[in-house]
Regions:
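A short beta-strand submotif of the Rossmann-like class I SAM-dependent methyltransferase core
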Residues: 123-126
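Acceptor-substrate binding/catalytic loop of class I
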Residues: 161-180
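Conserved S-adenosyl-L-methionine
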Residues: 186-197
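A short acidic, Gly/Pro-enriched loop at the edge of an enzyme's catalytic core
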Residues: 109-120
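Conserved N-terminal segment of class I S-adenosyl-L-methionine
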Residues: 2-110, 137, 251-252, 262-273
Length: 276
């Protein structure tokens, strides 16, 4: 039954591929999401806000900006930047008139800020889109103040059910990110989040279908397409809110892992990196 539903949904999409932009792969307000997806969104900013008390904060690749307001509760100033015009317009419209929040169109490879401008930089689910991540790390180091912090998270490519995002260039493991960051003058701590739970029979079927879909490039390319697929297999979804809030999902804090450890049993990796 699940296989039939999946193929009936996906084959027409593959016959009618369209050009996509970053907005179409952004977890934007109003898109249906599972409880775990909402928890992941909430966890990102709940984790980051601990570093933001009284600080100047920059979120690079902020998408539609759902996290900016949450960070601004503690931060002195929050700047959100994204390369996608639609994302920037959405965030600007929502935060219009909000004190302490600024939204800019920026390129992560060439950040338009003076040296030593920020205490905290956040980069969530975006490093794998960058053509030259080393340029971003160089720029991040340049604009961070002494003892500044870079907080990152990424889908875990070592998880067996990992599915690469459209437009992605290169995914990095936790170990690879730590090694890369340390080449650019950071001291990095790897963490992992969302351990894989024991699978039910239904979960096993969905997992098999997902792996087949990934192998043959049949996974929908847009967030809206993925939303429809989730409805088929998972039923009712909840809408992603325009601003992160404490009631939207469970907080599952990332856990420290040993350096050099391969991470097969978690869906998400985090890195907390500090300027040497």
């Amino acid at each position: 039954m699940y296989v039939d539903k999946f193929m009936n949904f996906i084959l027409p999409m593959e016959k009618n591929k369209i050009n996509i932009n970053y907005n179409t792969v952004t977890e934007a307000p109003g898109i249906g999401a599972t409880a775990q997806q909402l928890s992941m969104l909430y966890t990102r900013y709940r984790y980051a806000v601990q570093f933001c008390e009284g600080k100047d904060v920059l979120e690079v690749a902020c998408g539609s900006g759902q996290g900016l307001g949450y960070l601004a509760r503690k931060a002195r100033k929050v700047v959100g930047g994204d390369i996608d015009t639609t994302n920037v317009a959405t965030a600007r419209d929502y935060y219009k008139g909000r004190t302490g929040i600024e939204v800019l169109k920026i390129d992560a490879h060439q950040l338009p800020f003076e040296n030593n401008s920020f205490d905290v930089i956040i980069l969530y689910e975006a490093i794998y889109y960058f053509e030259m991540p080393e340029k971003f790390f160089t720029e991040a180091k340049r604009i961070l103040r002494d003892e500044g912090v870079l907080v990152m998270c990424s889908a875990n490519k070592e998880w067996p059910d990992f599915n690469p995002s459209p437009f992605s260039k290169t995914y990095y493991s936790a170990t690879e990110l730590v090694e890369l960051l340390e080449k650019f003058g950071f001291v990095a701590e790897p963490l992992a989040a969302y351990p894989v739970e024991k699978l039910t029979t239904r979960d096993c079927v969905v997992s098999i279908i997902k792996r087949i879909a990934v192998q043959f490039h049949l996974v929908p390319k847009t967030m809206r397409g993925k939303e429809l697929l989730k409805k088929i297999f998972l039923g009712k979804l909840s809408s992603i809110p325009p601003e992160i809030n404490d009631e939207m999902g469970l907080y599952l804090p990332p856990q420290s892992i040993s350096r050099g450890t391969r991470v097969f049993g978690h869906k998400v990796i985090y890195i907390t990196a500090r300027v040497k």
